[in-house]
Amino acid sequence: MKLSQFKFKLPEEKIALHPTKYRDESRLMVLHKRTGEIEHKMFKDILNYFDDKDVFVFNDTKVFPARLYGNKEKTGARIEVFLLRELNEELRLWDVLVDPARKIRIGNKLYFGDDDSMVAEVIDNTTSRGRTLRFLYDGPHDEFKKALYALGETPLPHTILNRPVEEEDAERFQSIFAKNEGAVTAPTASLHFSRELMKRMEIKGIDFAYITLHAGLGNFRDIDVEDLTKHKMDSEQMFVTEEAVKIVNRAKDLGKNVCAVGTTVMRAIESTVSTDGHLKEYEGWTNKFIFPPYDFTVANAMVSNFHMPLSTLLMIVAAFGGYDQVMDAYHIALKEGYRFGTYGDAMLILDK
């Protein structure tokens, strides 16, 4: 498939700048894959499409405050540092992106905090914007991490949410079950699940399985090739535990529904499948890129937000729901006033 096939006109006012007051009160478009039928519901109605022993697979990654603002030594120029991942605990080494990149060179010292209490030295260039920083901090690692994160802010994707970070973002840009720290962006489909909704799902007998995929900035990176077979995804760290495997495979063996909550879950579970179509334990990295046509093995239902034009996330959804049906559904969503993006509305795709 070609990149240009995922282009559509998305007016700026259709992008949600804030979440709905209650997590489960966003709108939900339900697409029935086999018939093409579309229903317009509230997110809390998702419960009505699943039964006892069906399984929802969630990504329990936790977003950390990855965006820092600081100053460069001598010039005092304001800089932005985006923390990607810690490379070495002992040496306090971090893989980061910097802005403005042309002014930040090896050997430069960067200062953070009102009193310049946190200092980092640039020790390597990794890409045009990528750098390796060594933080000059004496003290236990836990203390360092706490001090570093206290200086950071919620890493809202500026390409989608073009507004300053607000207090509520620290809570709302995080799922209620976020546990394993390591993501620099939230798995957005999971943001719709409230405690009340999950309690009602439990009462109905629906099972939950949790995997971890630390969502990275690659989700927002522009694709620069027209031929999608030539695109390379950034690698992301993922963990599929024995417990998750048991829950998912039991549901599959019983002929029950398995619903992947979000594109990160779909990529993770499709990255570790045995030849007989069962989920396998896995700890490592994935750079799996899913686009149409693609045969899915594990899940037969999927929840996802409404994504940006030309994004890899839209491609996964189109691969699962069928290209024509999903693109038609997106046009209907625009016409019906659905909200797009990180804090937008959701779509449920059912294989029936």
From Swiss-Prot:
Monomer. GO terms for molecular function: S-adenosylmethionine:tRNA ribosyltransferase-isomerase activity. GO terms for cellular component: cytoplasm. Its EC number is 2.4.99.17. Transfers and isomerizes the ribose moiety from AdoMet to the 7-aminomethyl group of 7-deazaguanine (preQ1-tRNA) to give epoxyqueuosine (oQ-tRNA). One of its GO terms (biological process) is tRNA wobble guanine modification. Belongs to the QueA family. Keywords: Cytoplasm, Queuosine biosynthesis, S-adenosyl-L-methionine, Transferase. Pfam families: Queuosine_synth. Gene3D superfamilies: QueA-like (3.40.1780.10). This is S-adenosylmethionine:tRNA ribosyltransferase-isomerase. Its main location: cytoplasm. It comes from Bacteroides fragilis (strain ATCC 25285 / DSM 2151 / CCUG 4856 / JCM 11019 / LMG 10263 / NCTC 9343 / Onslow / VPI 2553 / EN-2). Pathway: tRNA modification; tRNA-queuosine biosynthesis. It catalyses: 7-aminomethyl-7-carbaguanosine(34) in tRNA + S-adenosyl-L-methionine = epoxyqueuosine(34) in tRNA + adenine + L-methionine + 2 H(+). It is an enzyme of class 2 (transferase). The keyword Cytoplasm applies. PANTHER family: S-ADENOSYLMETHIONINE:TRNA RIBOSYLTRANSFERASE-ISOMERASE. It is found in: Cytoplasm.
